[in-house]
Amino acid sequence: MLWVDKYRPKSLDKVIVHEDIAQKLKKLVSEQDCPHLLFYGPSGSGKKTLIMALLKQIYGASAEKVKVENRAWKVDAGSRTIDLELTTLSSTNHVELTPSDAGFQDRYIVQEIIKEMAKNRPIDTKGKKGYKVLVLNEVDKLSREAQHSLRRTMEKYSSSCRLILCCNSSSKVTEAIKSRCLNVRINAPSQEEIVKVLEFVAKKESLQLPQGFAARIAEKSNRSLRRAILSLETCRVQNYPFTGNQVISPMDWEEYVAEIATDMMKEQSPKKLFQVRGKVYELLVNCIPPEVILKRLLHELLKKLDSELKLEVCHWAAYYEHRMRLGQKAIFHIEAFVAKFMSIYKNFLISTFG
């Protein structure tokens, strides 16, 4: 088992990071009925850990007895029937799913499937809360239609169902949904908090950490606790005992994006654009989110660019990220940004060096 799963806090009392939020959640569910909740914050900040600990606080050990199912449904959509398939993670009292996995059909997931689950109260309550919890991941990636359907579902089945929504950015969630939830902002942990967790993991694994080693891992983690723990485990596999100057390797996909940035700086041509497109597609196939690719690519380019170009390149990166949110095929928008950058950079080189 990966350390990131092995040492994930199982209850609100054992949470190391965000202790204040954990105690407020504990008080909330013990004193009154839990409202709909919206957890939002950067990836790796600990949203999912808090949600799972909260479920255990509400339902006890039964919340940990989960099973993974690939479920299929037939949904009537006017004159035709749509076949939907989605992976769910469920226990007696809660169901977890990611409706945005259904793509443009996400509104049918929200309309029909959540409705079906919300109608059924948990049978085996044993004196616990008489409602079922639906955990919806990546709510910020739902289409507008799906979010409107979700709002109606929240109102209609609030007596038998509570929704816990999870997303990276609340700005992409409609005000109608946000106003019906208690919004819980989960900030990225500080470097000091990450160091504290790494030292806790190292102690549990009986590892000796050199002076400043945990701080170096925390610094390279970009304030992602998940990434920091994975990096520590990777370093343990690569070389132990640790050394003070041990290299903390970047992730493979980050090195690959750095190569793409170097290619874009070296040559600006249709041939190179085609090669870059292939590399970007390879990253997408390996499940690297398109917005993460674009953000990392911009980061690598800014390290190499002249200061007078940085503002314009940032503008176009933001423009194509926005276009990517509105469209369906992410590869088109990343490729468009690459082409735009090549055009800007080539014109800059011509005007500077002739």
UniProtKB/Swiss-Prot annotation:
Q: From the UniProt annotation, give the residues forming the signal peptide.
A: none
Q: Name one GO biological process term.
A: DNA replication
Residues annotated to bind ATP: 41-48
The subcellular localization recorded is: Nucleus
Where's it mainly located? nucleus
Keyword match Translocase: no
Molecular function terms from GO: ATP binding; ATP hydrolysis activity; DNA binding
| Domain of life of the source | Eukaryota
| InterPro entries noted in UniProt | AAA+_ATPase, DNA_pol3_clamp-load_cplx_C, DNA_Rep/Repair_Clamp_Loader, P-loop_NTPase, RFC_lid
One GO CC term on file: nucleus
Q: Which UniProt keywords apply?
A: ATP-binding, DNA replication, DNA-binding, Nucleotide-binding, Nucleus
* Entry keyword Nucleus: yes
PANTHER family on file = REPLICATION FACTOR C / DNA POLYMERASE III GAMMA-TAU SUBUNIT, REPLICATION FACTOR C SUBUNIT 3
Stated role: May be involved in DNA replication and thus regulate cell proliferation.
- Subunit: Heterotetramer of subunits RFC2, RFC3, RFC4 and RFC5 that can form a complex with RFC1.
Q: Which family does it belong to?
A: Belongs to the activator 1 small subunits family.
What's the protein name? Replication factor C subunit 3
Organism the protein comes from? Arabidopsis thaliana (Mouse-ear cress)
Task: Name the gene behind this protein.
Answer: RFC3
